């Protein structure tokens, strides 16, 4: 069921979204060569719990049937990992690209956002892929308006990405969000204009395209969480939580520092 947030609930979503963005700002200086992704998780967990007074939503989250609960507080997806990478003793190296995905719960409401980071100087391909994904996310967000449809968002993303000769992952998508981490509707990053659910003021959704440098096909690893590109090509993702307003949209997870 799609939930329409009251003005009071929207205010709580704004707070949760702002705090999630603060986590991504805080961790940025720590994303460097020689640092293990589990250390990034530890840093974020401590900040989320002790500094912000929030709950890290991914920790012990139960996803698909049969999969173990997610064991960490953030997702770290490096290079060809598309999404849901589990922080580990894997040490970052110069040239890596990494997506850090953070979801916090504050006063019962979720703020969900992710951002790409470069470890040292990126390759030309990595730089271009990351920028195209970022621009695609914003094209999708700018397609949000009351009376529009989710297909408008997906089409804006897909058409731009494919025009740039990259591919959009189809097996994973954005979602409604609020008191529940993953609510209806599904927010596909591909589609046709005018298709899908109508956008109504008070809806809160995530827009989080996953864009591959190679083919769009992905596979799920044996841990039940980590998703990688089948052809081992690089993948990038950006994410914001967005409120549908009477005038258009409001991004709830913008960095207080103006980034993202």
Over which residues does each language-model region extend?
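Active-site neighborhoods and metal-handling regions in enzymes and metal-associated proteins
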Residues: 1-260
